[in-house]
Each structure stands twice: as structure tokens, then as C-alpha cells.
Amino acid sequence: MEDEEVAESWEEAADSGEIDRRLEKKLKITQKESRKSKSPPKVPIVIQDDSVPSGPPPQIRILKRPATNGVLSNPNSTTRPAFPVKSLAQREAEYAEARKRILGSASPEEEQEKPILDRPTRISQPEDIRQPNNVIRQPLGPDGSQGFKQRR
């Protein structure tokens, strides 16, 4: 590369034929490489013959799984902490206490007995005020002409 002259611009290089020479060199190199890569790989291929034993068959061992998802533990220890079982009366008492604390009333029956007056009643419109669904429009132009119906 030291003996090659560097052109001032690509136009000078094209005029002198330098670009063509470089392209030809690269093309020859790639053709040589492609010829080398087309040859089949030289890997030894072993052909098995039935007359020669291939060796002992692979050993298969059946392993036992641990009792609890891969974790070996004592049978005395449990995975979940034991919570005391509450009776229905205890659960209802806790629910009433929490409801009183949050909502201010102890039982849902108290609220159902009161009529709900806060909700506005729905006012229905009479049928004659409503607009018909089959509205037919007849467009007019800006100057009062027939609009789209105008023929030319």
C-alpha cells in the first residue's frame, strides 16, 4: 500500500483506472476464498457396522423423588403455620366490629331498612319531544343554491 498513490478525489481515481484495479483485486480474492470453502469439510465419518459390537448399552437408573418438592425436612415440621380455627360466631363478631369501625354501622340490615332518598329519580321525556331517527337533510350551497343536487 505504500507504493500506491492516493488520488485527490474519487473522480481522479476513476479516470486513472485505480478504482477498477482495486475492484478486480478484491473480486479475485473473494473468488479464491469461495473456491476453498466449496470443498467438503474434511471430518472423519465413522460408519457403524453391525458385525462389530458398539459397546455396552447406556445405564438407566430410576431415582426416587424426595417427599416434599425437592426439600428434605423432618416430618414433625409443617410448611404452613397453624392458625387457630375460628368458629362462625367469632368470625361474625370480628366482621361486625370491623364493619362498625369502617362504615359506622354494625349490621347490613340497618342500612337496608332505610329508604334511599338521596338518589334522584329518573325523569323520562315524553315521546313527542324526541327527535325522529330518520332525519332527511337537504344541503344548500353557500349562495342558497341546490347544493349537491345541482346538475352541471
UniProtKB/Swiss-Prot annotation:
Q: Which PROSITE patterns match?
A: SUZ (PS51673), SUZ_C (PS51938)
Which parts of the sequence are annotated with region: Disordered?
A: 30-86, 100-152
Lineage: superkingdom:
Eukaryota
Q: Where does the record place Polar residues bias?
A: 70-80
- One Pfam annotation, family name? SUZ-C
Query: What InterPro entries does this protein map onto?
Result: SUZ, SUZ-C, SZRD1
Where do Basic and acidic residues bias regions lie? 113-130
Annotated SUZ domain residues:
42-107
Q: Where is the SUZ-C domain?
A: 111-152
Which PANTHER family does this entry report, sorted A to Z?
A: SUZ DOMAIN-CONTAINING PROTEIN 1
What protein family does this chain belong to?
A: Belongs to the SZRD1 family.
Q: What is this protein called?
A: SUZ RNA-binding domain-containing
Organism equals Gallus gallus (Chicken)
